[in-house]
């Protein structure tokens, strides 16, 4: 039986970058592909970027228990299909879910043995600097991200471990150790 690891943390903390580095060094890790009701963006491919579903199909998956976790953001739904995760775990592979806080809480309820890791910034000020440094969000969007980040940071005590991402290489080594890969 494989192991299930959940990683969450606020926007701008470096989850995506850290997961990319983790996968480059550990190709045996399987990362779940999310389902969504939003329309595909240019270059996105079915089954690789997301599984694109109608709202009706997504709602049916929720009702059937076909999603490990799901949430709605900005009018679109996102979730983690249950069957592929269970198949990979049965095959003995390490499985990684990079999801939002509420999704991590949902997974905890259905997979109590999942290792839950919270990725934290070295400080709130550094997190704000990173979010502003992207240069992609309006001031209103930045304020929304920061408000949400405060809520998420207050929940880090719910997790099995907290990894502070102030040095990418050190954070990567700590994450590998927590996942039993180091």
Curated annotation (Swiss-Prot):
Predominantly, its location class is cytoplasm
- Describe the location of the Guanylate kinase-like domain by residue ranges: 2-180
Q: Which Gene3D superfamilies match?
A: Guanylate Kinase phosphate binding domain, P-loop containing nucleotide triphosphate hydrolases
Name the SUPFAM superfamilies for this protein.
P-loop containing nucleoside triphosphate hydrolases
- rRNA-binding as UniProt keyword: no
The record's EC number reads 2.7.4.8
Similarity comment text for this entry: Belongs to the guanylate kinase family.
Q: Please give the HAMAP family that the UniProt record associates with this protein.
A: Guanylate_kinase (MF_00328)
PANTHER family per the UniProt record, alphabetical: GUANYLATE KINASE, GUANYLATE KINASE-RELATED
Q: What is this protein called?
A: Guanylate kinase
What organism is listed for this UniProt entry? Parasynechococcus marenigrum (strain WH8102)
């Amino acid at each position: 039986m494989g192991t299930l690891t959940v990683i969450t943390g606020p926007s701008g903390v470096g989850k995506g970058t850290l997961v990319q580095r983790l996968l480059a060094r550990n190709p045996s890790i399987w990362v779940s592909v999310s389902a969504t009701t939003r329309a595909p963006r240019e270059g996105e491919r079915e089954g690789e970027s997301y599984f694109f579903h109608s709202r009706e199909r997504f709602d049916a998956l929720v009702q059937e228990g076909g999603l490990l976790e799901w949430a709605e953001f900005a009018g679109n739904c996102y979730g983690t299909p249950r069957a592929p995760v269970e198949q990979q775990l049965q095959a003995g592979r390490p499985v990684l879910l990079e999801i939002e806080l509420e999704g991590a809480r949902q997974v905890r309820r259905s997979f109590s043995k999942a290792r839950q890791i919270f990725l934290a910034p070295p400080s709130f000020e550094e997190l704000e600097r990173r979010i502003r440094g992207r240069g992609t969000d309006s001031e209103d969007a930045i304020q929304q991200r920061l408000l949400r980040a405060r809520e998420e940071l207050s929940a880090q005590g719910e997790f099995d471990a907290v990894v502070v991402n102030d040095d990418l290489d050190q954070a990567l080594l700590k994450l590998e150790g927590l996942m039993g890969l180091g």
